[in-house]
Amino acid sequence: MSKRDYYEVLGVARGASDEELKKAYRRCAMKYHPDRNPGDAAAEATFKECKEAYEVLSDGNKRRAYDAHGHAAFEHGMGGGGGGPGGPDMGDIFGDIFGNIFGGGAAGPRAARRGADVGYVLELDLEEAVAGIERRIEIPTLIECEPCHGSGSEDGKVEVCATCHGRGQVRIQRGIFAMQQSCPHCDGRGTLIQNPCKTCHGAGRVEEDKVLSIKVPAGVDTGDRIRLAGEGEAGPAGTPPGDLYVEVRVREHAIFQRDGDDLHCEVPIRISQAALGDTVRVATLGGEAEIRIPAETQTGKLFRLRGKGVRSVRSRSEGDLYCRVVVETPVNLTADQRELLKQFEATFTGEDARKHSPKSATFIDGVKGFWDRMTS
């Protein structure tokens, strides 16, 4: 059966960047890795296909050769031993899946592999995000199997793989290139289990809901992430666990809108307060504060209350609270109130009205000028 195009295997365009290739490989590895699909031969075959594609496309020289000649670039002189003469040694370029993606460095299966990182979205009210909180969460994850202590073996015995001699990797020759890849006999583990654990079926890990207590620092905002080292999935065959990344999302607030460390809100005032001036009380996250409204205040005027915003989670400086005044039209008026407003309105005549309502006069003049230009 002919091989599929490597770009098709990873689901990327031929011009994909290194980062796009890495992300595509990560998605494939997380979905089809044998540790996640024990006993599934089809998933294992797909995983190996993705790994082979990534090993070629992630290396500049091999990618150029593949782009020029396709699979034919690697079909001659294949062997199972060490690198042939004259060919560049690609020895340690390719680690195990978790070494490549998550930063493993040392050779060998136990050094290169680790558990997968886990993500969790934590929703908070604004007050909780501003003040900080300790929250208990429950996450589904893979933990080390207790009966076999993560070894995957019922009796605790494992055998060193005779093919790779425990390294988990073998070197093969493909055309002019020598490269290193996971051992197909032990799937990169370096060991073989003859008597699999009855609890985890040889995986060394079992699914379980883990309960954790998270201390959320004061001042966090949507998009901030909290890393809990070692609280991700247990690593295969007793290797180190991954990390847990908690992403914060702050719910919308009924009064305040957040912009970084600053807060914004609207403060409704009556027409009489706007015209005559007044002192109004406004809510802040720390209690109430006063704003002095000067006479003849218009809708949209901003008042700044310094230090009444959010204390920064990074610099510990405090943001400000910006209060936008909105002059509210009165409703549910009594007959007497309506009559008073009519009498008040009657006092605005001719040029006097323009003097008391400068924005209205400017608007009317603008409309008149527009129509004059349109009809001239």
UniProtKB/Swiss-Prot annotation:
Q: What is its main location?
A: cytoplasm
Where do the CXXCXGXG motif repeats start and stop?
145-152, 161-168, 183-190, 197-204
| GO biological process assignments | chaperone cofactor-dependent protein refolding; DNA replication; protein refolding; response to heat
Pfam (any one): DnaJ
What are the subcellular locations of this protein?
Answer: Cytoplasm
User: Which terms are listed as keywords in the entry?
Assistant: Chaperone, Cytoplasm, DNA replication, Metal-binding, Repeat, Stress response, Zinc, Zinc-finger
Disulfide feature: none
> What does the note under cofactor report?
Binds 2 Zn(2+) ions per monomer.
**What SUPFAM superfamilies does the record point to?**
Chaperone J-domain, DnaJ/Hsp40 cysteine-rich domain, HSP40/DnaJ peptide-binding domain
Q: Where is the J domain?
A: 5-70
Instruction: Please provide, in alphabetical order, the Gene Ontology terms of the cellular component aspect for this entry.
Output: cytoplasm
The record's SMART domains line, in alphabetical order, gives: DnaJ
A molecular function (GO) held by this record is: unfolded protein binding
List ligand-binding residues for Zn(2+) 2.
C161, C164, C183, C186
Where does each CR-type zinc finger lie? 132-209
Please tell me where Zn(2+) 1 binds in this chain: C145, C148, C197, C200
Q: Which CDD domains would you find in this protein's record?
A: DnaJ (cd06257), DnaJ_C (cd10747), DnaJ_zf (cd10719)
In terms of InterPro entries, this protein maps to: DnaJ (IPR012724), DnaJ_C (IPR002939), DnaJ_domain (IPR001623), HSP40/DnaJ_pept-bd (IPR008971), HSP_DnaJ_Cys-rich_dom (IPR001305), HSP_DnaJ_Cys-rich_dom_sf (IPR036410), J_dom_sf (IPR036869)
Q: Give the UniProt family note.
A: Belongs to the DnaJ family.
Q: What is known of its domains?
A: The J domain is necessary and sufficient to stimulate DnaK ATPase activity. Zinc center 1 plays an important role in the autonomous, DnaK-independent chaperone activity of DnaJ. Zinc center 2 is essential for interaction with DnaK and for DnaJ activity.
Q: What does this protein do?
A: Participates actively in the response to hyperosmotic and heat shock by preventing the aggregation of stress-denatured proteins and by disaggregating proteins, also in an autonomous, DnaK-independent fashion. Unfolded proteins bind initially to DnaJ; upon interaction with the DnaJ-bound protein, DnaK hydrolyzes its bound ATP, resulting in the formation of a stable complex. GrpE releases ADP from DnaK; ATP binding to DnaK triggers the release of the substrate protein, thus completing the reaction cycle.
Query: What is annotated about its quaternary structure and interactions?
Result: Homodimer.
Q: What name appears for this protein in its UniProt entry? A: Chaperone protein DnaJ
- According to the entry, what is the taxonomic lineage of the organism? Bacteria, Pseudomonadati, Pseudomonadota, Gammaproteobacteria, Lysobacterales
